[in-house]
């Protein structure tokens, strides 16, 4: 190989490597996406949400989306979930009312269901992404069903429930995408209509991180589920994550009785 040919190959390799590198520094929401402007109408595709700009990986998200994980997550047939909150610029969550936090108008909550898939870059393939938007006097819901390749997906019309066949842990089952009435039935049974994001659901570490990320004006107190018996604590925690959002003693459509840890 001549020195000229070697030089050309080296330059080509260098250029290819430079193009393949991920951009350095924080990623910001793409202009025109819902994440960039939470007041926009819900888009028709997942790409237009702007939440996952580097698919097929789901780990890269814009700085506007703050990730969080509840201490007691809702059980969904073993599916994992990615949760993000996006506040309008210059706003914070009002946590002065203990476990009935107030969220700024146009706050967005995203929840993405994933199933284990070793062929996917993150080891998890997305199945569905749900979006909740807080309005001044209402709440809006949207759901998006991912394509099989995990690169994009389409918005569901929420008129009828949709079932998606999913294999998780060696078992195949039908994952249910709810209709709008089902969304409302669960969410409207909770005083804030936001599930999994409250003083009883976030750890002190998560609250500290979200405070650093300017989600809270000051770190709120957390209300951990406590009991001397670890097994009882796990049971009460399961109630907290899976039952109390409906069964909390309020006047919501599914609140016929109270399973809060103070009562149960």
Mark where each language-model region is:
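Sequence context surrounding c-type heme c attachment/ligation sites in exported
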Residues: 20-29, 100, 118-264
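Generic detector of short alpha-helix boundary/capping microenvironments
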Residues: 6-7, 73, 94, 171-174
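Bacterial N-terminal signal peptides that target proteins for export
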Residues: 1-9
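C-terminal motif of bacterial Sec signal peptides marking the signal peptidase cleavage site
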Residues: 16-18
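Conserved small-residue
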Residues: 27-97, 103-105, 110-117, 125-166
């Amino acid at each position: 190989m001549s020195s000229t040919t070697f030089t050309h190959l080296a330059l080509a390799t260098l250029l290819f490597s430079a193009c393949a590198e991920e951009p350095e520094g924080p990623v910001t929401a793409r202009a025109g996406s819902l994440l960039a402007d939470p007041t926009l109408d819900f888009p028709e595709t997942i790409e237009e949400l702007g939440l996952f700009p580097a698919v097929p990986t789901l780990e890269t998200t814009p700085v506007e989306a703050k990730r969080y994980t509840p201490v007691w997550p809702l059980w969904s047939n073993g599916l994992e979930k990615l949760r993000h909150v996006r506040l309008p610029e210059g706003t914070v969550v009002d946590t002065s009312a203990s476990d009935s936090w107030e969220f700024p108008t146009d706050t967005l909550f995203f929840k993405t269901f994933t199933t284990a898939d070793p062929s996917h870059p993150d080891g998890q393939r997305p199945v569905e992404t749900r979006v909740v938007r807080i309005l001044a006097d209402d709440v809006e819901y949207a759901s998006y069903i991912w394509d099989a390749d995990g690169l994009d997906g389409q918005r569901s019309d929420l008129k009828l429930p949709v079932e998606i066949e999913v294999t998780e842990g060696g078992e195949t089952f039908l994952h249910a995408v709810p209709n709008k009435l089902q969304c409302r039935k669960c969410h409207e049974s909770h005083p804030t209509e936001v599930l999994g994001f409250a003083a009883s659901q976030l750890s002190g570490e998560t609250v500290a991180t979200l405070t650093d990320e300017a989600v809270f004006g000051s770190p709120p107190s957390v209300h951990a589920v406590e009991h001397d018996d670890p097994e009882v604590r796990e049971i009460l925690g399961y109630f907290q994550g899976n039952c109390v959002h409906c069964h909390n003693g309020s006047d919501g459509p599914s609140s016929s009785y109270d399973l809060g840890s103070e009562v149960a």
